[in-house]
Amino acid sequence: MRTLCSLLLICCLLFSYTTPAVGDLKHLILKAQLARCYKFGGFCYNSMCPPHTKFIGNCHPDHLHCCINMKELEGST
């Protein structure tokens, strides 16, 4: 019985642990999304984009919106 409990504990610890590589990958994705937003002249906004702007993507997985001013969008075309 003691062996079974020990084995169960080890399995729980192994499957619940997030590796540092996963954290690093998430950080790189966040950085890439933020850089892409700024590259196109956008800015990050916490809620829906204001009326004079357009939604062009996400800044982070935390549901921040990447918005761009309509004047900048018209000037680039």
Curated annotation (Swiss-Prot):
Which Pfam families does UniProt cross-reference here? Defensin_beta
**GO biological process per UniProt:** defense response to bacterium
Q: What is this protein called?
A: Beta-defensin 11
Which cellular component terms (GO) are annotated to the entry? Answer: extracellular region
Where in or outside the cell is it found? Secreted
Instruction: Point out the signal peptide segment.
Output: 1-23
Which tissues and organs express this gene's product? Expressed in both adult and neonate brain, and very weakly in kidneys, epididymis, and testis.
What does the UniProt keyword field contain? Antibiotic, Antimicrobial, Defensin, Disulfide bond, Secreted, Signal
- Has UniProt tagged this entry with the keyword Signal? yes
Give the gene symbol. Answer: Defb11
Q: What is the lineage of its organism?
A: Eukaryota, Metazoa, Chordata, Craniata, Vertebrata
| Protein family according to the UniProt entry | Belongs to the beta-defensin family.
Q: What does this protein do?
A: Has antibacterial activity.
Disulfide-bonded cysteines:
C37-C66, C44-C59, C49-C67
The protein's organism comes out as Mus musculus
